Amino acid sequence: MAKLTKRQKAIAEKIESGKQYAFEDAAKLLAEVSAVKFTESFDIAINLGVDPRKSDQVVRGATVLPNGTGKTVRVAVFTQGPGAEAALAAGADRVGMDDLAAEMKGGDLNYDVVIASPDAMRVVGQLGQVLGPRGLMPNPKVGTVTPDVATAVKNAKAGQVRFRTDKNGIIHTSVGKVGFDAAALKQNVEALLSDLKRLKPSTSKGIYVKRVTLSTTMGPGLVIDQASLEA
């Protein structure tokens, strides 16, 4: 059996196996045991009572976290005319059409979010093999194909997270950084849960939100007592 490192021992001493933690207690404990040389993210995993093999039970969408993610988000926008001016005014890092597409085909993909107006999809459609594997392809279901590109840019910059159930029916996303106030982090998670419940498929039966687990980038996962969350 492999020996535990000092850090693993310290974590094991503080965490009770099988316990469900009140959200703010979990956030504070995870911050305490964080001992890496970079600022870790807080990540959430939410097990949903859906059958991801059925297309009508795939849950996907986007949530603007009220307190942001703590990350600097780079946004590229495909649009033209007044939309281009509005996108730049809203804080977009790069706005263009064919010129932007050429840059991306050439490997310039240093963006976290790509947004497009509907009239720009003729250009964006050429980039499926470039943007798709990186999760950057604009999609109307998560608000990244929209005539209101300015609002989409503001939402992305403010800390919007996009989510989709994986093959096991689990939603994974970052909800903040270690160093966030626990109450602010809780508000972010509650906003996400509220949207997930709004998007519950009509064909989903039984318990919908089955399990909520909070972790840090390099840390353990703690199961959250859902009674400690208001959503």
UniProtKB/Swiss-Prot annotation:
Record GO terms (molecular function): rRNA binding; structural constituent of ribosome; tRNA binding
Domain of life (superkingdom): Bacteria
Keywords: Repressor, Ribonucleoprotein, Ribosomal protein, RNA-binding, rRNA-binding, Translation regulation, tRNA-binding
Record GO biological process: regulation of translation; translation
Pfam families linked to this entry: Ribosomal_L1 (PF00687)
GO cellular component: cytosolic large ribosomal subunit
Entry similarity comment: Belongs to the universal ribosomal protein uL1 family.
PANTHER family tied to this protein: 54S RIBOSOMAL PROTEIN L1, MITOCHONDRIAL, LARGE RIBOSOMAL SUBUNIT PROTEIN UL1M
Assembly and binders: Part of the 50S ribosomal subunit.
Record's function text: Binds directly to 23S rRNA. The L1 stalk is quite mobile in the ribosome, and is involved in E site tRNA release. Protein L1 is also a translational repressor protein, it controls the translation of the L11 operon by binding to its mRNA.
Protein name: Large ribosomal subunit protein uL1
Organism: Stutzerimonas stutzeri (strain A1501) (Pseudomonas stutzeri)
